[in-house]
Amino acid sequence: MKKLINDVQDVLDEQLAGLAKAHPSLILHQDPVYVTRADAPVAGKVALLSGSGSGHEPMHCGYIGQGMLSGACPGEIFTSPTPDKIFECAMQIDGGEGVLLIIKNYTGDILNFETATELLHDSGVKVTTVVIDDDVAVKDSLYTAGRRGVANTVLIEKLVGAAAERGDSLDACAELGRKLNNQGHSIGIALGACTVPAAGKPSFTLADNEMEFGVGIHGEPGIDRRPFSSLDQTVDEMFDTLLENGSYHRTLRFWDYQQGSWQEEPQTKQPLQSGDRVIALVNNLGATPLSELYGVYNRLTTRCQQAGLTIERNLIGAYCTSLDMTGFSITLLKVDDETLALWDAPVHTPALNWGK
């Protein structure tokens, strides 16, 4: 294994120290470790908090700043952040209007964020939750019960962050997050595995003519391992799966801060249909050249046009990664005029930065 690290035990500490030094708009907190906006808490605005195991950079710490997250909690590589990190970060960023926890649907994340939610409620913080489960590839896997939360998380953090920035209430921000989760669909493929530094070897092996179709962002298995032939055929198979697996009925939990209890709510993901307008994200899972991602986007635009989908905005690059995995994911999120206005609103974070 050749990686730009000193010691596998220091990877998280050193990368977070570098992030904070590169971006004075962020503050790195210690004991426990978490990252916040330098100006947090911001009075009069809902605070957004997310987190996960490290290895997915720039998610989530790279999305802290004006118009997006107020704070983020990084765990060790592919390991959920502990409840004390989440609790302390939320206490630090709460400006009095409440804290919204954005949680990707992985068993460890759910357990730890739910524990922190109850601790925050007991401490007098107005808090609620949104669970993200956009991966259409599999239901139930190594890390999850139900579908996995992947790159649509980035789009939701941007859009709900813009709503919080303009002064929307905690309930309105949470409702928007749940709506966007039901309108977003993602799928990924891998041509090569990632290497977790502590393991020192690739998490799986593929033959030269194979791909892992529907791979997870921790290297989890997908739908199947199938032959790899060409860019166009790969994008076609992914696009068809996004459309075919769009409809999804399940029950998700959220915290009702008024009742002080967990509530279960049946929800339905909406399949994409001709006439829909979308934000398209072509996401590098770690080691795929940008030139190849643009080739993917070229084919994706053709397939969207054929299906009657209008791409209103796009992102192409590394936004939700899996260390050094060779591969990519596609996310399509249904939008309307209001959603696009939130997307175009100013955002100033290390990884997304536009507007005044």
Model-found features: residue ranges?
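N-terminal amphipathic/basic leader segments beginning at the initiator methionine
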Residues: M1-L48, D208, D337, A345-K356
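Short glycine-rich or small-residue beta-strand-to-loop segments that form or flank ligand, phosphate
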Residues: K2, V46-G53, L69-A72, G98-T107, ...
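Glycine-rich oxoanion-binding loops at beta->alpha junctions
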Residues: H56, Y63-G96
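Short, acidic/small-residue loops that bind anionic groups at enzyme active sites
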Residues: A72-I77, H121-G146, T310
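Short Gly/Thr/Asp-enriched flexible loops that form oxyanion-binding sites at enzyme active sites
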Residues: I110-G124, Y143, E292-N298
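Short alpha-helices
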Residues: I132-H185
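Mixed-charge interfacial surface used for oligomerization/domain docking
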Residues: D168-L293
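C-terminal non-catalytic interaction/assembly regions of soluble proteins
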Residues: Q259-K356
